[in-house]
Amino acid sequence: MSDTPASTFGGRRAVPPNNSNAAEVDLPTEELQGLVPRGVNLKDYLNVTAVHLFKERWDSNKIDHHTDKYDNNKLIVRRGQTFYIQIDFNRPYDPRKDLFRVEYVIGRYPQENKGTYIPVPVVKELQSGKWGAKVIMNEDRSVRLSVQSSPECIVGKFRMYVAVWTPYGILRTRRDPETDTYILFNPWCEEDAVYLDDEKEREEYVLNDIGVIFYGDFKDIKSRSWSYGQFEDGILDTCLYVMDKAEMDLSGRGNPIKVSRVGSAMVNAKDDEGVLVGSWDNVYAYGIPPSAWTGSVDILLEYRSSETPVRYGQCWVFAGVFNTFLRCLGIPARVITNYFSAHDNDANLQMDIFLEEDGNVSSKLTKDSVWNYHCWNEAWMTRPDLPVGFGGWQAVDSTPQENSDGMYRCGPASVQAVKHGHVCFQFDAPFVFAEVNSDLVYITAKQDGTHVVEAVDATHIGKLIVTKQIGGDGMQDITDTYKFQEGQEEERLALETALMYGAKKTLNTEGVVKSRSDVTMNFDVENAVLGKDFKVTITFQNNSSNLYTILAYLSGNITFYTGVSKKEFKKESFEETLDPFSSKKKEVLVRAGEYMSHLLEQGFLHFFVTARINESRDVLAKQKSIILTIPKITIKVRGAAMVGSDMVVTVEFTNPLKETLQNVWIHLDGPGVMRPKRKVFREIRPNTTVQWEEVCRPWVSGHRKLIASMTSDSLRHVYGELDLQIQRRPTM
């Protein structure tokens, strides 16, 4: 086959872009050199009669390549590792006089130098890192080959041909979709850029199709299961379609750096008709609220079938879908949650909270926001484009926050580089550094236009960074992979390095902060249950021999989890007198009627307490977010939990509120157990229970989960889950 196909494109670009896995052109079945003499029948020479790929789930190809979980009847292998095929001929193969080779082709304009046309020669011995095919069996009319792919091979769906040489040219098999072969990244191959040397980590970060995503508040961490479903029917093709939709050149699809960067742009629909439309305004017309999704499968399959972005997602939904994309293609990946995450538009390492002179927060001047939590992903890969030591986990974020090189995407940024302040290395390291390292600065805006720094909290941002633990549903603290402990010499050095490499710090807060006040203030919020009253307790402590009078303000706000306030539902001011070396508590009652009618998606309430000491004019400020405790869905099963056996799943929910829930949707999902399903209830009256039954037939054994969510006009973020142990069907 010629290295460059004929093209009508002229000028500097003689070959059109090859950016679609789905687009294809058939290779010719004959490539003859000159005329074939009369009486010569090319079928008398060696001809292929059948090709066997050993592509069933129980065949060694899929088991050895850890692809037996994919619900896909094509051959799926991982690059850099041998697999087996068998070719049947019309007569016995004689290696002394017969010559043939296997060919793999991807895209519409295949070229050998681009890796889109791969001729695989038959060799005596396979060489590490190179394509080759070795005959391991030659019996009767059948030849079995051990085929080795390159560990740098393009990742995608290849078309396969077998070419046989005759004295008059090449004979080639016809295009046969049954021989199509998917080639994926290979974390089990030491020469692959995504190689991960720990089997338990590979089991978790590549093969686990159910995860746990953490959300809530630093003081009230909550978790929810998420069905990644990377092995479900149609998901692999959808992930390839996502790259096609991005018009990503096929030659770059073997590079995990490029694939993850394209994925971070394409999972959101901000500027490229990607997978998910983001919405943070609590209005979800013509779509599904973010909290209703139970996993990635419904989202990706809807995107593929409609070829339009799916509505709606927020950070944990973007992260869940992106995790599916990465794991499906073979890139080790995990979802990360950063508590108190700075959304720093200009990456100046500073979140400014402006106060008026009386101590109230100035909503007019305060533009920065601190997200209660933010989810992104980490992908494991080498970084040959960076200095040694910056490979490993890379932060990648598909939530559309800021523009990077003209598109809404973020990463991959080396986590190790972020920790040490080396923000000069691509991609988007300054933004990630700011998310976990910014200072929270309280500034009084004087009437004369001057600003006075009242306090700096250097420990609030990036308070805790977590992910799911390996082999369990618990939480693993990975904060120390992103930052050194506050006060360590290494932490100061990392900040200085970041500033040297271009990170900005608007205000020099060193030495500007006022001296420590004689009075300290703290406040606590008791466990708040949705629909119930609760108390906020503020404590003042006078550590001096002076008498002080205090004017304090409490502001309660309904907030998005992004820290943006929607509605102030509680405002109270009070005065307290503090005797020397004394403490005093103030209790404020918050009634359910004050907040219920204003609630948003996740039930976040944010309290801000400021106090001014009249005698010293010192300002004290504290803030705290809470998430209301929300009722759960109950899931029960009856029947044998066995592959191929019917099992009845019952979903049950009781409305604990005093109001009727309208337009209720319940979503149910369980990878390997049942396909995602939805059920609508027109209403659920107060203290009324609804039930929904579905019959399913599991097809995957081992530990499985059923995951349910409920959403309505006035109540969302309701979840439930059930762990299952699905037994194998006994062999007869």
Curated annotation (Swiss-Prot):
Binding site for Ca(2+): N437, D439, E486, E491
Subcellular location: Cytoplasm; Secreted
Reported cofactor(s): Ca(2+)
GO molecular function terms listed in the Swiss-Prot or TrEMBL record: metal ion binding; protein-glutamine gamma-glutamyltransferase activity
Listed InterPro entries: Ig-like_fold, Ig_E-set, Papain-like_cys_pep_sf, Transglutaminase, Transglutaminase-like, Transglutaminase-like_sf, Transglutaminase_animal, Transglutaminase_AS
Protein EC: 2.3.2.13
Keyword Phosphoprotein: no
Carbohydrate attachment residues: N614
Active site: C315, H374, D397
GO annotation, biological process: blood coagulation; blood coagulation, fibrin clot formation; peptide cross-linking
Annotated family: Belongs to the transglutaminase superfamily. Transglutaminase family.
Quaternary state and interactors: Tetramer of two A chains (F13A1) and two B (F13B) chains.
Identification of the protein by name: Coagulation factor XIII A chain
Species assigned in the record: Mus musculus (Mouse)
Lineage: Eukaryota, Metazoa, Chordata, Craniata, Vertebrata
Gene of this entry: F13a1
